[in-house]
Structures are given as C-alpha cells and as structure tokens.
C-alpha cells in the first residue's frame, strides 16, 4: 500500500473530457477476456495487454494500472436462436449472435514489478477509489461509436396521409384476384388510395418487374399514396405504403379508414406479398448472396497467420473485405508487419497511439498476419456447428482512417471502392516524408491521354491513378442467343425474375473482361475542343493508355445504373475473368516519330469560357426533384455538366459537406502554395495547377477534376514537349514491369446499391482460394470470379 501511496501523483481522476479505454489494448487486440487481461493506465487512461503494458511504463513512467479481467459464465449450449425480424446485427430483432456472458474482476497493479492490490478495498487511498470507480462506470471510448446496426431506417408518417382526399367512385376492392387495370400483371400490384385504381409497380432496368403503370398514374393525377396489395393484414403498420411525392415507404396512421373507403376489411386479409423491407431481408437467401458467400457449401474453417477474420462493427464489411486484400500484398505486409514491430510503431507514436495511423495500421497488420488471434474459439458456430474464430474488431483503425470523413466515420454502409481510394490517399499523405516506404505506390500507375486534332497534330495529358474503372459493354455479351431465349421463355410463362425457383433458370449477360479493357482503351470524341493549331473549336479524338504497369492492378467494374427516381441499381451481369491477363497492348508509347505537337497557348477568352458554369437544364431537373437551386448548381459544376445522373450522384454524396451552402465563387484572391504543391505532385504543370485552383475555389479535389475535364487548359501545358524529356516511370517513382497479371483478390458485393447490402473478399493464398466473410474465414470451393465488384491482380514478373 505504501508503494501505491508513493505514486499517487501519477494517478488522475478522469474528467468528462477524458477518453477512457478499457475494452481493447491500443497497440494490440488484447481485451479483458485475453489470458492476461487488460491494464488501464490510471494517468493517460490508455489500455494495454499483458505483453505490452511494460512498453508503456518504459515510455511514460506511469506505474499505476487498473487490471480488468473477464471470465466467461457458463450458459446452456442448447439456448435457442431467435429468428431475425430485422436486417440487423447486435440490435433487438436482429440476428442473434448467441454471445456468452462474462464476469468482470478488478485489481490495482503497480509496475514494474506487477505488485497487485485488491479492488474494491476500503484500504485504498480515496483518490484511487474515486479514479477507479470513474473508470469502471464510464462508457469506454471504444464503445462510444454507434452499436453495430445493419437495419433499415424507421418509416415516417407521410405528410399526405392526414389530408388525403379520397374520391367517391363506388369502387369496391375484392379480397383477392387482383389485376393491373392497364395490363395483365397479377403481382406487385399497388392500390392508389385516392381513386382506388389497381396498377402494377415499376419496371426494372433490364425489363423485369412491372410496367410502371402505378408511377405513371401518379404523374398524371398527382394522387400521392398507394398501398401494396398482398401486404395488408390485421397488422396495418406492416403494410407497404408508398408516397410518390416523398419517394419513400411511409406510415399512414389513417390506413384503416382509407381502406374502408374501398370496402376493404383489413382484419380478414392474408399476406401474400413481401414488403420492401422483407424483400431486402430475403436477399440474405437469394442466389447472389448464397453464391458469393458460398452458403450451403461445406466450407472448411482455416486458422493461422494470414487467416484472421474481422468483426463486423455494423456496416463495416466494406472495410473488412478491402483490408483483407490490402494486407495480402507484399507492400503492405512489408511496411506494417515484416519490417515494423508493434514496439517500434508504439515508440514512434504520439502520446495517444489510438490516433496515429501508422500505429493502427501496424496493429491491424500484426493482428491479421501474426496468427495470434486466428485460433478456434471455444464456442462453435451457432448455425453450422463448425469451429469458429472470434476475429478482431478493427475499431481503432476505423476511427483513425475515417477521421474527419463524414461518410466513413458514420455507421452507414459505404462503397468499398471509395474506401480503397480513401485508404490509398491517407497512406500516401502519411508517407510524404518517407516516400520510399509508401506501400500505396505499389498500386499507382501512369495514364497518358493522346488527343488527336483534325489538323493531324497531337497533345498528351499525363496523370497518375491507382484503379482502372471499367465500363461494361453489354453489347459484347457472349451469350446473346441464350439471353434472347431466356427472355422469350420468361415472357411466355408470364414470370418475373423474382419468381424463378432455381438460380439455373436465370440467364444473365456474360461479358469478357477483355472487352471491358478494350472499351477503356478505345478512341472517343471530345466535343467543343479548342485546337491551338486550327485556332477554333473542333472535335478531337482521345485515346488512353498506361505509361507504367503497377505491382498490383486494381480493376473496378462499373456495375451500377440509375433507375427511375434516380435510385442506384446494380447492373445484373457476369464478367468472365481469366486467372491471368496480359495488358501489354495497353501501354502508351508517348510522342512518336513523325507526330507534331499542338502549339502552345490557349487564348484567354477560351480559358475564361472554361470556367465552370452550371448547365441550366441539369439544374432545372434537379430542382424539380426538390433540391435547392444552389446545391443543384454546385452538383452540375462539380461534375462538369456530365448529366443529371452524375450530378445526382455528386449531390447525394456531398449533402453533408460543410461548405455545401457557401456561395459559388470562381475567384480566389490567394492560391495556397501547399495546394499548388499537391497538384504538382500529381504531375500537373504549375500554371495549370494555379488555373485549376482558381477555377475551383482552392479545392484540390475539384481542381483535379477541373484539369481532367478541361483538356483545353491542360494539353499545351502537360504535353510531352519532347520525347527525350518525358519522365520514365522509374524517374517518377512509379513501379513498372511487364503486362502479365495474375488474379489474387476479389471484392464481391451483394445488394441493390454500393451503399447497402454486404461485401465479401476472396483471396488466393498458398495456392487455394479463401473466403473472408467478416469474421468467418474458410477454404473457398467456388470463388465467384464472375461476380466481382473490384478485382485485384498481381504482376507476374
């Protein structure tokens, strides 16, 4: 006790502003449930596992720790699983994780000799008792994030329900036998609550679904509410009511009265159709979900180094799938595991290692690759009875990598591709002082755009990227005859795709990956291009190639289209991806003998005309959807007036931007030199960088887009003025080699859009494919190579 009293000055009583860690070690994934328990520093309130707490004592000199140990309680092994009613994890009504319960014990430990004192104890100094009580009763910093939730938003009461005017038409709706009033559809039918018309639902992008008669009726009449027939039962809140003006499923508190107007006795009706939310739940068992997750297959669990699962924190599968593949690359393994120990990263970290990206990447790398946390758990999988592993929660890493990012710091589902790009950018910026150690460079490559003017002269633009984003040319499908026969058969049977009983009955377009790559490299026209040779506007031809081939080639398949109502939907297509590809033909050759460069100089008036101005037609369409004029103008400008779909995508992803309501300004009195330097590092000329920053209000991301979308501004400044002066990939710091690549990683997506559903990774390890489905890791028997969203290839040489 005297030893404790002599160190009282190193004990703090936590203030409300203190971040208290007590659930997980800040440099490893040890927890109170680990064999050695967890040690909370009673000065900094950081937590450390048994093997690491001495490092903190050596670094800080803090000797007093609260030791927390959790011991599992015994529970009946035959505890029944609850059937889920929500697409959710860790919430009431969601999937039952069958989590065990634990008893918690405490003691005071004084380093360096690990002298232990019991807690609670009246003999402890009052300051220590108060400090420990505060820590024990506090909500841990690790748990202040939202509880893992994978659930639809709660429906709101429609503003149109309380004022709905129903027409006295004398229509009486029978309890069954419904048919669309304008076609022969007998399923997916909606009853308009104003006039009693029964009409079919929306048509899907591929021709399946309804014939749009219900939504067309709304456009003709402005009658706002409809209820889906077949979802009406005694539980009226479960009925699927849709508001067309609000473009969402809603609650109608007067639904019983509105149904009675058409003679419907809801108490006697039976459920025959799935609601929108239930259809989303049903995706868990449809073909795509089962195929990608390999459900129904006897997957053999695999354990050991490199086979550690990641716990789903709630809509974090996009992060898990991406990081599993990233930490299967030699560059990330070397940087954050092989050549950097946990102790080395901790010693370099600031006072709070939980906020240090290098520390948390090293922690994650060691957690995934050491094998320490990849062992069979004592508890078997509740659904299969197979051995399972608990996995590690990437909570601290997510907090650091998502800091100050409105979307990734939320608990909403995100696009795995967007996260990969965000990760690469953060790692690159963190490696500014040591670029030779930057693992993100292994994904980088140069892109060269050749612009051919009708005069015969050429210009060249160069930039760097880390993904190839590929359009999918459906007209290149190799199974057109099968597709035609399938659609004829389906039309003859009167079946919708949702009615298909077997996945084998569904025929989808099959497009070779080679066709997608060829489409990327093909020529495309540039309208309204100012030719400095012709001194006027003309149409130029642009072709794109790669100036270098990266160590790891990332291919993104553009699988999403916009449906009516600007709802993003997935393109229902298979991509035939070979195990080995050769992109040698895509290498750009640069300025060739006999080619003449376009002359320098673009008139000032042309530059002024390149200032971004919103397309009035795009703005008008967006405004008609209920968005503000200013927001719509910004969306059009920031997508270079590419179209309503592109502007809508930008608008939906930037609604929470802090400057979204700031006035549009094309003038910047002072250009920040650091922003110029950043653009220079991308390979842009200085005067182009300054023009771009001026045109985009100093925003680096917008300035980059401006350069790419304004070739008039960049050709004369970014061209290859001399074939001898052009930098080689080695001079620019980019990796390079041959064009042959081997497929080693696939991120697959299940769901109707990138912002919902589920992501899974398949990785080729030690000659076999392995599935990483959050914390489930097993040998893959049927990797979905044709269903990938993002493909990762490794250069063979």
Swiss-Prot record:
Belongs to the peptidase C19 family. The lineage of its organism: Eukaryota, Viridiplantae, Streptophyta, Embryophyta, Tracheophyta. A zinc finger (UBP-type) spans 156-266. Its EC number is 3.4.19.12. Residues 613-654, 670-710 form the UBA domain. It catalyses: Thiol-dependent hydrolysis of ester, thioester, amide, peptide and isopeptide bonds formed by the C-terminal Gly of ubiquitin (a 76-residue protein attached to proteins as an intracellular targeting signal). Zn(2+) binds at residues 180, 183, 200, 213. The keyword Iron does not apply. Keywords: Hydrolase, Metal-binding, Protease, Repeat, Thiol protease, Ubl conjugation pathway, Zinc, Zinc-finger. The keyword Metal-binding applies. GO terms for cellular component: cytosol; nucleus. The active site is at 317 (nucleophile), 758 (proton acceptor). InterPro entries: Papain-like_cys_pep_sf (IPR038765), Peptidase_C19_UCH (IPR001394), Ub_carboxyl-term_hydrolase (IPR050185), UBA (IPR015940), UBA-like_sf (IPR009060), Ubiquitinyl_hydrolase (IPR016652), UBP13_Znf-UBP_var (IPR041432), USP_CS (IPR018200). This is Ubiquitin carboxyl-terminal hydrolase 14. GO terms for biological process: auxin-activated signaling pathway; cellular response to gibberellin stimulus; embryo development ending in seed dormancy; leaf morphogenesis; protein deubiquitination; proteolysis; regulation of cell population proliferation; root hair elongation. GO terms for molecular function: cysteine-type deubiquitinase activity; linear polyubiquitin binding; Met1-linked polyubiquitin deubiquitinase activity; zinc ion binding. Pfam families: UBA_7 (PF22562), UCH (PF00443), zf-UBP (PF02148), zf-UBP_var (PF17807). Constitutively and ubiquitously expressed (at protein level). Recognizes and hydrolyzes the peptide bond at the C-terminal Gly of ubiquitin. Involved in the processing of poly-ubiquitin precursors as well as that of ubiquitinated proteins. Involved in seed and embryo development. Residues 308-796 form the USP domain.
């Amino acid at each position: 006790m005297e030893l404790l009293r002599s160190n009282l000055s190193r004990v703090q009583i936590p203030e409300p502003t203190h971040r208290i860690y007590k659930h997980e070690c800040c440099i490893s994934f040890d927890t109170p449930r680990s064999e050695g328990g967890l040690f909370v520093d009673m000065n900094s309130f950081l937590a450390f596992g048994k093997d690491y707490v001495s490092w903190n004592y050596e670094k800080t000199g803090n000797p007093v720790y609260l030791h927390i140990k959790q011991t599992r309680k015994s529970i009946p092994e035959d505890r029944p699983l609850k059937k889920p009613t929500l697409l959710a994890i860790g919430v009431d009504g969601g999937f039952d994780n069958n989590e065990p319960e634990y008893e918690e014990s405490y003691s005071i430990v004084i380093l360096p000799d690990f002298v232990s004192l019991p807690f609670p104890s009246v003999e402890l100094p009052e300051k220590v008792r108060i400090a420990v009580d505060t820590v024990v009763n506090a909500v841990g910093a690790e748990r202040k994030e939202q509880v893992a939730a994978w659930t639809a938003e709660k429906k709101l009461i429609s503003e149109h329900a309380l004022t709905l005017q129903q027409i006295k038409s004398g229509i009486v709706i029978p309890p069954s036998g419904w048919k669309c009033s304008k076609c022969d559809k007998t399923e997916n039918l909606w009853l308009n609550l104003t006039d009693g018309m029964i009409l079919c639902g929306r048509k899907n992008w591929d021709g399946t679904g309804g014939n749009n008669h219900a939504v067309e009726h709304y456009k003709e009449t402005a009658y706002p509410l409809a209820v889906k027939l077949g979802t009406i039962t005694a539980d009226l809140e479960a009925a699927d009511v849709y508001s067309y003006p609000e473009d969402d499923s809603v609650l109608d508190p007067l639904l019983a009265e509105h149904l009675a107007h058409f003679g419907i006795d809801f108490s006697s009706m039976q459920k025959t159709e799935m609601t929108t939310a239930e259809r989303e739940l049903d995706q868990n068992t449809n073909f795509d979900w089962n195929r990608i997750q390999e459900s129904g297959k006897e997957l053999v669990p695999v354990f050991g180094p490199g086979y550690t699962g990641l716990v789903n924190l709630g809509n974090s599968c996009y992060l898990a799938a991406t990081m599993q593949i990233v930490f299967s690359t030699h560059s990330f393994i070397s940087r954050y595991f092989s050549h950097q120990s946990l102790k080395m990263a901790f010693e370099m970290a600031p006072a709070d290692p939980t906020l240090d990206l290098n520390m948390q990447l090293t922690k994650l790398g060691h957690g995934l690759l050491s094998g320490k946390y990849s062992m069979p758990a004592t508890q078997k999988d509740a659904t299969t009875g197979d051995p399972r592993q608990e996995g590690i929660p990437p909570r601290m890493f997510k907090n650091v990598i998502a800091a100050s990012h409105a979307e990734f710091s939320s608990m909403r589902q995100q696009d795995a591709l967007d996260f990969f790009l965000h990760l690469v950018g953060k790692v690159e910026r963190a490696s500014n002082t040591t670029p030779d150690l930057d693992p993100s460079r292994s994904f980088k490559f140069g892109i060269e755009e050749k612009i051919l003017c009708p005069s015969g002269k050429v210009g060249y633009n160069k930039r760097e990227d880390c993904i190839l984003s590929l359009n999918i040319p459906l007209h290149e499908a190799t199974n057109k005859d099968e597709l035609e026969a399938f659609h004829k058969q389906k039309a003859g049977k009167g079946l919708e795709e949702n009615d298909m009983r077997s996945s084998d009955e569904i025929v989808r377009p099959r497009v070779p990956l080679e066709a997608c790559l060829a489409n990327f490299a093909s020529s495309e026209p540039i309208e309204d291009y100012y030719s400095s040779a012709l001194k006027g506007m003309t149409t130029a031809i642009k072709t794109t190639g790669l100036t270098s081939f990266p160590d790891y080639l990332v291919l993104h398949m553009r699988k999403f289209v916009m449906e009516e109502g600007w709802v993003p939907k997935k393109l229902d297509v298979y991509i035939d991806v070979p195990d080995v590809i050769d992109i040698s033909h895509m290498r750009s050759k640069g300025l060739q003998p006999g080619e003449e460069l376009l002359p320098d100089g673009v008139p000032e008036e042309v530059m002024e005309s390149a200032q971004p101005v919103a397309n009035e037609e795009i703005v008008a369409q967006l405004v008609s959807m209920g968005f503000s004029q200013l927001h719509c103008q910004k969306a059009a400008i920031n997508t270079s007036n590419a179209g309503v779909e592109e502007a809508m995508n930008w608008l939906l992803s930037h609604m929470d931007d802090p400057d979204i309501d700031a006035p549009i300004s094309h003038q910047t009195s002072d250009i920040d030199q650091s922003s110029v330097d950043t653009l220079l590092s991308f390979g842009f000329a200085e005067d182009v960088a300054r023009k771009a920053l001026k045109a985009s209000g100093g925003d680096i991301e917008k300035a980059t887009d401006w350069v790419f979308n304004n070739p008039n501004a960049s050709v004369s400044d970014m061209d290859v003025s001399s074939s001898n002066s052009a930098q080689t990939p080695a001079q620019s710091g980019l990796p390079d080699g041959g064009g042959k690549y081997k497929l080693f990683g696939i991120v697959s997506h299940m769901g109707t859009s990138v912002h919902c559903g589920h992501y899974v990774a398949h990785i080729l390890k030690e000659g076999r494919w392995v599935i990483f489905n959050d914390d489930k890791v097993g040998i893959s028997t049927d990797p979905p190579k044709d269903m990938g969203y993002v493909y990762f290839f490794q250069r063979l040489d």
